[in-house]
Amino acid sequence: PQNEIPQYLAKRLPEVGGVFVQAESEIAAINMVYGAAGAGARVMTSSSGPGISLKQEGITYMAGAELPCVIVNIQRGGPGLGGIQPAQSDYFQAVKGGGHGDYRLLVLAPATVQEMVDLMEKAFDLADEYRNPVMILGDGILGQMMEAVEFKEEKKTSQMEKPWATTGAKGRKPNLINSLFL
């Protein structure tokens, strides 16, 4: 019910050497993202307003542990399950920190379906550069629209080195991912 992103990625990612994993719940999904990001993978998850609320604790842990990821939120306004009409509730949750703790997300807000596509690459680059979750905050109606989009020509980019990632000790001191430093 959230959006068509998982449907598309389930088909497309294996075609380009990626991996798609369907989680059993929003809470499981954000924890899978935490684990994959901690291992240095470029990783994303998507949901709508109520699902993002369920992911908030995991998002705060990721921000605290400085783990990069992309979170797509196709907004639903209002309390409970909400609706697809424009509202500010998910906006406040995204830009003011929706969970416990003192953290902020980088938030990109596309105005068109094409811009949603175009901002994905930028979101991953920003997440890696700042070691912080990045949220793409799409309007609920925008998430329901269907129109032709143009994908940029794929460019081979080398991923930023992630010496902090938990990739196995491999002749070095083990890395530890932690969101609390005493």
Model-derived segments and spans:
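Detector for methionine-enriched segments
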Residues: 32, 44, 62, 116, ...
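Conserved thiamine diphosphate
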Residues: 86-140, 152
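Short secondary-structure transition/capping segments
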Residues: 41-48, 67-74, 118-127, 150-161, ...
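Thiamine diphosphate
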Residues: 1-97, 104, 121
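Short, well-ordered, mixed-charge alpha-helical segments that flank or form enzyme active sites
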Residues: 54, 78-81, 115-117, 142-147
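Fold-independent oxyanion-binding glycine-rich loops
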Residues: 23-26, 46-49, 72-75, 109-112, ...
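Conformationally flexible catalytic loops at phosphate/diphosphate-handling active centers
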Residues: 131-182
